Amino acid sequence: MGRDTIADIITSIRNADMDKKRVVRIASTNITENVVKILLREGFIENVRKHQENKKDFLVLTLRHRRNRKRPYRNILNLKRISRPGLRIYSNYQRIPRILGGIGIVILSTSRGIMTDREARLERIGGEILCYIW
């Protein structure tokens, strides 16, 4: 039985965000690096750096937190895994869902790599819906 690396990084980021931690360390694979690049480009995380420990590569993510002293702390990251190893979810480019009217993003795995819903619509290709982020 294999590991679901995408679910692992989503859970790590969600737990760190709820615990108000600023830094998260996740295992580095090709898939996680591509997903993290999308999160960085879309502004959901502040910084990424690669770290090696005992011949294993890790990604160290710096999360973006919105702090307001008048109101209580609010999580800014909502992540949901959609397609999973036991139930794969595929969509063509016309049926890719819009999250919060385009505010959130859908991350897809396509034949041209991992990309956001906007990029997939522009290139007119569908794929496996990996996760929603809003």
UniProtKB/Swiss-Prot annotation:
One of its GO terms (molecular function) is rRNA binding. Pfam families: Ribosomal_S8 (PF00410). It is found in: Plastid, Chloroplast. Keywords: Chloroplast, Plastid, Ribonucleoprotein, Ribosomal protein, RNA-binding, rRNA-binding. One of the primary rRNA binding proteins, it binds directly to 16S rRNA central domain where it helps coordinate assembly of the platform of the 30S subunit. Part of the 30S ribosomal subunit. This is Small ribosomal subunit protein uS8c.
